[in-house]
């Protein structure tokens, strides 16, 4: 729905707070925003599940910004004082003032492309003037070619710091010379900016966009950033994020639990330790050599001993001294030796079926402390490593290409991760509240929530430290002074387990309904095929009867589903194995002429998700092109893969979502085995006040979270519709709360045959919607192809670029999907005729109703036998009342202009003309009471709530067809003039006659 911020609707949530929303919100949006306002008032946290397509992002932005605006108005003097402090003001402001000014909003999402969409949504609202910035790495922002040509992000950072310290970056120097007022003048556009906007402004003004965005974050009211910038202690430290008195929003938070655990985990190899030792030796040798050269220089320049002394440290990087390097080198040597001893000791136990050994996390802390690195010394340890890396890179012309500081970087990151997770204040936060504080501050308390795992590969050790408590990361945020944490997603279910594991103080847990009371989704659990029950176990992948039944089920659904079908498998290996069997196995009798795979390819254009990310754009393009073809397309993909998240499949692209099997995590994966071991250990502990989650429940929850995320592809907005097919009998025994609340009432069980019948009936009832979506999808594809051509033409300047290098984020990002602004055509004012019961007056006979241009039907085949074939085109002309059209083969030269047929009252079929003359007062005569109620509700909805004409068409179709098609056609008189022509054209297309 396109909205104009100037025409926003004021929504009162309670007696104190109103929200300016771009349009009249649906009930589910009101409920969502009320929950946000309530927890902000109470200074509590929230877990908010709302189905995809219900305006979750818009509701989050409008409600939080409205609440902050109200607070700002109540403290105008404090806010004005803070804002006038200028760049760096957040650091200079006294704590007392800091506590009194408005909270900063941190809006986090998984990827930068998702954040681009947040910017797009924000600019639809009246809150677009709020001072906003977006944070990202140099990889996204930097415009200095010396840095851009470097691929590794860590090296980019070190090279950038070196250029900045030497004043060798023109873009940074110009940024550094900017006054605060000038910077604000450059960046103030009257609306929020995404990364592309920052880079464009930076390039135009030769000013570093990376540092501009970071500086703006010091005084911004809304900061957009990826998850890990908030969760990862190293990133918080790097970007100097001040979380005190802030509101932190995690959008798309369904994966947040695993992300929190991952960011509190760490990995290091003995190879990295050995490389770190070699790099430290190299730095030490270079440093000693430089000191010797400095002494010789001093001896040559000074006649009297001691009369002129050179401060050697000023010739080197600040604080980098040979004695520090030698002490550090000794500690790393000891660490390498202690890890070898630990692996051979009985402190680690074997963990079948894994090859390595494991123990509680406390063993790692003990090993690090015995190596001279504990919580008190780690800061200095890491600082020396960082200085050594910068020094090594500053000598890059003198060192080999392999000596880039990667080993030192790995050791530094490992230590920071461990001790950021195990700082004493964190231990105090995550300890049980019923235990005395003195007993909670020991970092070993935190280590009980972690597992150390070491394995040996080809004689080299791999040390992994797994954190299995997401609450550690969340409570670390609260310890930093975060005021509220809001977790939102379309799929948080099963939500009770999710909220338990996050460990926050939830004031609201919402499982929201869909915007539509009757969700236009058909969900079928297929329990049986021709040969029996469908159980997608690992063993059944080799069972030819099971694989055949799954293949037959897919074919039947593909045959009865129009447009696009998404098929999700549990894993790449499952998908590959089943496809391989389908390609070899004949369908039906042994003498059947075609295999399962051949039949699928005849039914739909098939695309398969690749393992390599760089190949995904081409596969995505093949699928979208296939969807617009007569038989449609099917995309085979995997749960938790690149397709199941992060890509928006709208309307025609996801008429059916099929899930084959249940996507349980790999049972022999190291993290899975150790997580289950950790949960089993918790079940045996008697010192816990709350009953922990069992390993069985966690394992099932992980699977269904992936299922629900894939299911979310089927509905993307209020006018969307589709089917969900779950091919596995085990879904039938799942508890209802494992599925999203909005889906539960749509689920039924059936066998393969009945599933196909129900699917066919479902889409037959929505035939007119499907026809309309075809033309809409073609328009969308035209814009997408134009965007794709623009991206391709931009890359053509570099002969090394290839189409496979263009990512999905390039092709389908909000930036590339922007539509050129067209001249706005004001609709004719609507006149109300008091003599009639019509809501809108009938347009005059001179109002011409334009029929769509029929585009050239281009042959999609790429192999053309001769050039003359290229000139043979077919054109379709349509006359009023005959929607089938006639094919006319042209000569060798196509027409220069496309023909346009205009539809007027005079050119309509006679019966249509008669129907349009029926007074609107006749529409409800003889109508049943129920139909009258539905009719009135439809008119009110159309007039008051921006109901789409397609929905009006569908509702009126149910009332008047097949009994009174003349009244159905006459109903077009109650529509706005711009919708009336579409209504009549749809009626002609469906051959509604009498």
From Swiss-Prot:
GO terms for biological process: DNA recombination; DNA repair; DNA replication; negative regulation of DNA recombination; negative regulation of t-circle formation; regulation of double-strand break repair via homologous recombination; telomeric loop disassembly. Pfam families: ARCH_RTEL1, DEAD_2, Helicase_C_2. The gene is rtel-1. [4Fe-4S] cluster binds at residues 142, 160, 169, 208. ATP binds at residues 50-57. One of its GO terms (molecular function) is DNA polymerase binding. Residues 833-844, 859-869, 880-889 have a biased composition (Polar residues). NCBIfam families: rad3. It catalyses: ATP + H2O = ADP + phosphate + H(+). GO terms for cellular component: nucleus. Residues 15-324 form the Helicase ATP-binding domain. It comes from the Eukaryota. It is found in: Nucleus. Residues 818-831, 847-856 have a biased composition (Basic and acidic residues). Keywords: 4Fe-4S, ATP-binding, DNA damage, DNA repair, DNA-binding, Helicase, Hydrolase, Iron, Iron-sulfur, Isomerase, Metal-binding, Nucleotide-binding, Nucleus. CDD domains: DEAHc_FancJ, SF2_C_XPD. A motif (DEAH box) lies at residues 251-254. Gene3D superfamilies: P-loop containing nucleotide triphosphate hydrolases (3.40.50.300). A probable ATP-dependent DNA helicase implicated in DNA repair and the maintenance of genomic stability. Acts as an anti-recombinase to counteract toxic recombination and limit crossover during meiosis. Regulates meiotic recombination and crossover homeostasis by physically dissociating strand invasion events and thereby promotes noncrossover repair by meiotic synthesis dependent strand annealing (SDSA) as well as disassembly of D loop recombination intermediates. The lineage of its organism: Eukaryota, Metazoa, Ecdysozoa, Nematoda, Chromadorea. Its EC number is 5.6.2.-. Belongs to the helicase family. RAD3/XPD subfamily. This is Regulator of telomere elongation helicase 1 homolog. Residues 818-896 are annotated as: Disordered.
């Amino acid at each position: 729905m396109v909205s104009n911020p100037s025409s926003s609707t004021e929504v009162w949530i309670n007696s104190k707070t109103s929200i300016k929303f771009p349009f009249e919100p649906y009930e589910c949006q009101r409920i969502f925003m009320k929950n946000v306002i309530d927890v902000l008032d109470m200074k509590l946290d929230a877990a908010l599940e709302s189905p995809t397509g219900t305006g979750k992002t818009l509701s989050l932005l409008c409600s939080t910004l409205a609440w902050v605006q109200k607070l700002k108005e109540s403290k105008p003097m404090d806010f004005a004082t803070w804002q006038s402090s200028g760049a760096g003001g957040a650091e200079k402001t006294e704590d007392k003032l800091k506590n009194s000014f408005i909270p900063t909003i941190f809006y986090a999402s998984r990827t930068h492309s998702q954040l681009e969409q947040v910017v797009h949504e924000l600019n639809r609202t009246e809150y677009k003037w709020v001072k906003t910035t977006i944070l990202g790495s140099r990889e996204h922002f930097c415009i200095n070619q010396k840095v851009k040509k470097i691929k590794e992000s860590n090296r980019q950072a070190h090279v950038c710091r070196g250029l900045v310290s030497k004043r060798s970056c023109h873009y940074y120097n110009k940024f550094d010379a900017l006054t605060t007022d000038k910077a604000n003048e450059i960046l103030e556009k009257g609306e929020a900016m995404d990364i592309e906007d920052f880079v464009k402004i930076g390039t135009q003004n030769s000013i570093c966009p990376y540092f501009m965005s970071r500086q703006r974050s010091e005084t911004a009211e809304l900061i957009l950033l990826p998850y890990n910038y908030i969760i990862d202690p190293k990133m918080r430290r790097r970007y100097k994020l001040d979380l005190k008195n802030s509101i932190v929003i995690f959008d798309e938070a369904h994966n947040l639990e695993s992300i929190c655990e991952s960011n509190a985990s760490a990995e290091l190899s003995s190879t990295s330790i050995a490389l770190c030792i070699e790099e430290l030796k190299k730095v030490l040798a270079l440093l000693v050599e430089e000191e010797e050269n400095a002494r010789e220089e001093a001896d040559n320049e000074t006649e009297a001993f001691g009369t002129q002394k050179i401060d050697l440290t000023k010739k080197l990087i600040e604080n980098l001294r040979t004695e520090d390097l030698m002490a550090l080198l000794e500690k790393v040597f000891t660490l390498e030796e202690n890890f070898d001893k630990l692996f051979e000791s009985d402190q680690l136990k074997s963990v079948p079926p894994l090859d390595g050994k494991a123990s509680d996390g406390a063993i790692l802390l003990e090993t690090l402390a015995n190596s001279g690195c504990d919580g008190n010394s780690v800061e200095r340890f890491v600082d020396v490593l960082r200085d050594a890396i910068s020094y090594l890179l500053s000598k890059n012309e003198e060192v080999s290409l392999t000596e880039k500081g990667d080993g030192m970087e790995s050791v530094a990151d490992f230590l920071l991760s461990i001790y950021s997770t195990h700082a004493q204040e964190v231990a105090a936060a995550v300890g049980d509240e019923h235990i005395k504080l003195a007993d909670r501050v020991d970092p070993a308390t935190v280590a009980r929530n972690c597992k150390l795992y070491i394995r040996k590969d080809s004689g080299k050790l791999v040390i992994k430290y797994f954190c299995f408590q997401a609450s550690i990361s969340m409570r670390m945020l609260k310890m930093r002074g975060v005021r509220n944490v809001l977790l939102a997603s379309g799929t948080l279910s099963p939500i009770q387990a999710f909220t338990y594991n996050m460990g926050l103080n939830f004031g609201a847990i919402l499982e929201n309904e869909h915007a539509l009371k009757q969700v236009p989704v058909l969900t079928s659990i297929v329990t049986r095929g021709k040969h029996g029950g469908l159980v997608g176990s690992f063993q059944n992948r080799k069972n030819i009867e099971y694989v055949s039944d799954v293949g037959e089920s897919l074919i039947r659904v593909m045959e009865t589903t129009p447009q696009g079908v998404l098929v999700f498998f549990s894993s790449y290996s499952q998908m590959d194995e089943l496809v391989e069997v389908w390609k070899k196995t004949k369908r039906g009798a042994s003498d059947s002429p075609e295999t399962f795979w051949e039949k699928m390819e005849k039914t739909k254009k098939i695309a398969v998700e690749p393992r390599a990310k760089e190949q995904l754009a081409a596969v995505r393009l093949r699928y979208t092109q296939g969807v617009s073809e007569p038989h449609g397309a099917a995309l085979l993909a995997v749960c938790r893969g690149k397709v199941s998240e992060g890509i928006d499949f709208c309307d025609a692209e996801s008429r059916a979502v099929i899930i084959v099997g249940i996507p349980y995590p790999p049972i022999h994966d190291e993290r899975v085995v150790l997580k289950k071991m950790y949960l089993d250990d918790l079940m045996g502990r008697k010192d816990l006040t709350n009953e922990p989650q069992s390993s069985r429940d966690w394992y099932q929850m992980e699977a269904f979270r992936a299922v629900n995320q894939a299911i979310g592809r089927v509905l993307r907005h209020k006018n969307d519709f589709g089917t969900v097919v779950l091919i596995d009998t085990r879904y039938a025994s799942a508890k209802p709360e494992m599925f999203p609340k909005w889906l539960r009432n749509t689920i039924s069980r059936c066998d393969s045959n009945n599933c196909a019948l129900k699917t066919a009936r479902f889409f037959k009832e929505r035939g007119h919607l499907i026809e309309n979506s075809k033309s809409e999808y073609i328009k969308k594809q035209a814009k997408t192809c134009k965007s794709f051509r623009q991206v391709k033409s931009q890359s053509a300047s570099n002969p090394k670029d290839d189409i496979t290098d263009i990512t999905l984020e390039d092709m389908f990002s909000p930036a590339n999907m922007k539509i050129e602004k067209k001249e706005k055509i004001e609709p004719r004012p609507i006149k109300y005729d008091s003599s009639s019961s019509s809501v809108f007056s009938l347009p005059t006979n001179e109002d011409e109703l334009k029929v769509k241009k029929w585009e050239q039907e281009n042959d999609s085949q790429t192999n053309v036998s001769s050039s003359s074939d290229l000139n043979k085109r077919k054109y379709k002309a349509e006359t009023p009342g005959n929607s089938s059209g006639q094919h006319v083969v042209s000569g060798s030269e196509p027409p220069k202009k496309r023909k346009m047929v205009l539809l007027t009252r005079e050119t309509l079929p006679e019966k249509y003309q008669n129907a349009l003359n029926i007074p609107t007062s006749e529409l409800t005569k003889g109508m049943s009471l129920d139909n009258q109620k539905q009719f009135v509700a439809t008119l009110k909805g159309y007039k008051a709530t921006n109901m789409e004409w397609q929905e009006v068409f569908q509702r009126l179709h149910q009332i008047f067809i097949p009994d009174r098609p003349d009244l159905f056609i006459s109903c077009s008189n109650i529509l706005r003039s711009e919708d009336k022509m579409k209504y009549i054209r749809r009626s002609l297309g469906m051959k509604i006659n009498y």
